[in-house]
Amino acid sequence: MVDRKRNYKDRDNRVEWEERVVSVQRVTKVVKGGKKLSFRAVVVVGDQQGKVGVGVGKASDVSTAVRKGVTDGKKNVITVPLTSSNSIPHKINGRFGAAKLVLRPSAPGCGVIAGGAPRIVLELAGIKNILSKQLGSNSLLNNARATIDGLSNLRTFVA
């Protein structure tokens, strides 16, 4: 059992993770004595080679919340199948809560045409040519998770 934990930590250290903070929000919890302030950080981690994850961290200060978000993001990493032109193999829809997202592959040289949280997720996944459209919700967290949902449902076709 000790060996498995050691292997997990070694694997984590070998991969060069890049992390970007999507949003930091001040949230409150109402308790008997008044309001308790804390911070919620939404963080995306990825290696720009097909692995990406979204994490959420909450703490009483911003830096701890971001660190917890990075740890959570590394626990929720998915692998994205990329084509030779660094795009996705086919069109896909992602959904999380009220957030809907349409992801379409695009021609080489087109770039990442996306906004907000989906753009950060797609760039950290290593996708270079893609079109995306957000529908429904404006929530950064839900749109990031809808992007992850869409990317996790991608399939590659073997002829």
UniProtKB/Swiss-Prot annotation:
Extent of the signal sequence: none
Pfam families on file: Ribosomal_S5 (PF00333), Ribosomal_S5_C (PF03719)
Encoding gene, per UniProt annotation: rps5
GO molecular function: rRNA binding; structural constituent of ribosome
Assembly description: Part of the 30S ribosomal subunit. Contacts protein S4.
Coiled coil: none
Keyword flag Ion transport: no
Compartments, record wording: Plastid, Chloroplast
Function: With S4 and S12 plays an important role in translational accuracy.
Alphabetic keyword roster: Chloroplast, Plastid, Ribonucleoprotein, Ribosomal protein, RNA-binding, rRNA-binding
Domain notes: The N-terminal domain interacts with the head of the 30S subunit; the C-terminal domain interacts with the body and contacts protein S4. The interaction surface between S4 and S5 is involved in control of translational fidelity.
S5 DRBM domain ranges (all copies): 17-80
Protein name: Small ribosomal subunit protein uS5c
Classification via InterPro entries: Ribosomal_Su5_D2-typ_SF, Ribosomal_uS5, Ribosomal_uS5_bac-type, Ribosomal_uS5_C, Ribosomal_uS5_N, Ribosomal_uS5_N_CS, Ribsml_uS5_D2-typ_fold_subgr
BP-aspect Gene Ontology terms: translation
Organism expressing this protein natively: Emiliania huxleyi
UniProt-listed HAMAP family: Ribosomal_uS5_B
UniProt keyword Iron present: no
GO cellular component: chloroplast; small ribosomal subunit
Recorded family membership: Belongs to the universal ribosomal protein uS5 family.
